[in-house]
């Protein structure tokens, strides 16, 4: 666990009356004994391990206390575990020093869990019953004779009726491998496919029995190019440079990896096999079903990480008193939860700019100056400070667009131009000096004055006169997102104007200016979402499609589902261009 992660507060999911530690969701493969090595650091601010004296560590399993042990630098625990998913908790019993209160407790040294290593299974007693095993072993041989496949008699492409009869004739292995291969290859499997898998099964079966045979068959599935790659085959007689429509099975894969970052489920595959997925009504029904599925959380994490630079948060190393790994994680979680609420509740994407609510825990609420929020649990709260509404007031954006010890109006302006307005500035010319390298800049009392000196260079002015005014409106937020009224000894001047002359005087006016051009923001969001969904950069010929999606979404208040449906029904999502000189696969 990160060294600057403070562990003085209760962690959601762990017993009350504890602090810090970790909660690990782990699937144990077999019924067996497992070894757990817990390493504990002496204190969050570098004190020796001797400070662990008197501390107690609670180990819990699925919410029930298993052990209570004195905290030492290294703790070894062995537990007999049943196979399957379990929640392992390792946390400290809260023991505040006499007279301590919340104001001063933050400065007190406290120990923390550094790592938990799980080793095992040791001397397994049974195979156990895990969710993955239940999904794979959809049948079990009734006798040794049933373990041997009855040489592919029926068509392997027919998933249920023929496979049921195969199982009754001793084809349990065939049934298992057929089902797995169909999901893994994202298409019906042929007799030849099954025969190949059964050959691997028989090799493993001879060496170690039925389970070993299935293991070998699965290993063959996992190295098949149809599993490793998303293959899309060109139809016969396609013409170079001409678009063609992908098959329903390929469309199903595009849709599932777009919304779930994973393979199609059986429902989607069944529709694709029938050849009806491309029909608008059917495609809309499946898309809405998938957006409502918990697996759509991957869209929030991956698309949000790509579009809003949330993946870059881990690289930020701000020099700011009180900044911890806890705060960094809370900032990312806030933005993800805002985006998730828009996806789950099918809200307008304009709420990303103008939401009058957000999600905070105690750490983030204190950072923002929000009262009456206690504990590590994230909760939805009303935003009463106009400057904090939407993405522009969130710590994730403000941190990732700053440098270690100051804000960066250039980075913030560039981020807004690229991600909210869709007009990225050109790359800077080579060998441009930093803003504070000139003697004149060294004498300036504020960052804004230094920027004005830098902008005096004609080579720099062309881009900076577009980016800097946007960044200046956000100067009341420091480099870790705290509100301020002064930059050093100079008062903050957040007045500026957009490149079209619109006057600005702070984050509220910038947000209102963006909302006044709501179609521009929605178009940019659509471009980002289509880029993510298609897995390629958009071209000039995609722009009419983007404009059509935005125009149609306006009729439904720019709800998130309207953008997704517009994209999945579009030609760029459903079609592909034959590249010149490519060979038929």
Whereabouts are the PLM-identified features?
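Low-complexity, glycine/serine/threonine/alanine-rich intrinsically disordered linker
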Residues: 1-585
């Amino acid at each position: 666990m990160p060294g600057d992660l403070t562990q003085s507060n209760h962690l959601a999911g762990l017993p009350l009356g504890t602090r810090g530690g970790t909660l690990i969701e782990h699937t144990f493969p077999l019924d067996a004994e497992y070894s757990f090595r817990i390493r504990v650091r002496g204190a969050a601010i570098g004190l020796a391990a001797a400070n662990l004296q008197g501390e107690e560590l609670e180990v819990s399993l699925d919410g029930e206390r298993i052990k209570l042990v004195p905290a030492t630098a290294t703790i070894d625990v062995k537990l007999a575990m049943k196979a399957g998913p379990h929640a392992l908790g390792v946390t400290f019993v809260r023991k505040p020093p006499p007279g301590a209160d919340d104001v001063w407790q933050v400065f007190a040294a406290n120990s923390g869990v550094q790592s938990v290593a799980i080793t095992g299974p040791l001397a397994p007693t049974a195979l156990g019953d895990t969710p993955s095993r239940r999904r794979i072993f959809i049948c079990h041989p009734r006798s040794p004779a049933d373990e041997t496949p009855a040489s592919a008699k029926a068509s392997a492409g027919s998933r249920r009726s023929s496979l049921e009869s195969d199982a009754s004739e001793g084809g349990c292995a065939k049934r298992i491998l057929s089902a797995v291969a169909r999901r893994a290859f994202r298409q019906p499997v042929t007799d030849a496919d099954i025969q190949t898998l059964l050959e691997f099964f028989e090799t493993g079966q001879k060496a170690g029995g039925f389970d070993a045979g299935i293991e070998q068959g699965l290993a063959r599935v996992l190295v098949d190019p149809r599993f490793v790659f998303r293959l899309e085959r060109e139809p016969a007689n396609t013409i170079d440079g001409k678009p063609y429509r992908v098959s329903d099975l390929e469309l199903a894969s595009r849709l599932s990896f777009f919304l779930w970052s994973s393979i199609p489920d059986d429902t989607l595959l069944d529709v694709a096999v029938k050849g009806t997925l491309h029909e608008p009504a059917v495609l809309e029904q499946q898309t809405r079903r998938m957006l409502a599925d918990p697996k759509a959380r991957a869209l929030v994490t991956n698309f949000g990480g790509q579009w809003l630079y949330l993946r870059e948060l881990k690289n930020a190393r701000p020099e700011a008193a009180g900044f911890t790994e806890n705060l960094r994680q809370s900032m990312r979680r806030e933005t993800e939860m805002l985006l998730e609420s828009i996806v789950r509740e099918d809200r307008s994407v304009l709420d990303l700019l103008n939401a009058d609510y957000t999600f905070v825990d105690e750490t983030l609420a204190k950072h923002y100056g929000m009262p009456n929020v206690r504990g590590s649990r994230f909760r939805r709260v009303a935003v009463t400070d106009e400057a904090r509404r939407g993405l522009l007031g969130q710590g994730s954006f403000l941190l990732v667009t700053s440098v270690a010890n100051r804000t960066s109006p250039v980075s913030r302006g560039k981020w807004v131009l690229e991600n909210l307005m869709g007009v990225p500035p050109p790359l800077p010319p080579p060998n441009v000096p930093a803003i504070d390298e000139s003697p004149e800049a060294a004498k300036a009392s504020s960052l804004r004055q230094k920027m004005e000196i830098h902008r005096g260079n004609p080579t720099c002015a062309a881009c900076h006169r577009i980016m800097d005014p946007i960044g200046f409106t956000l100067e009341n937020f420091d480099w870790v997102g705290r509100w301020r009224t002064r930059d050093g000894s100079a008062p903050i001047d957040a007045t500026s104007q957009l490149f079209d002359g619109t006057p600005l005087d702070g984050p509220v006016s910038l947000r209102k200016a963006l909302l006044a051009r709501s179609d521009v923001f929605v178009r940019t969001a659509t471009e980002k979402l289509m880029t993510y969904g298609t897995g390629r950069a958009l071209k000039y010929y995609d722009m009419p499609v983007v404009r059509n999606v935005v125009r149609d979404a306006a009729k439904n208040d720019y709800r998130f589902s309207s953008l997704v449906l517009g994209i999945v029904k579009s030609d760029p999502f459903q079609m592909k261009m034959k590249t010149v000189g490519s060979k038929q696969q």
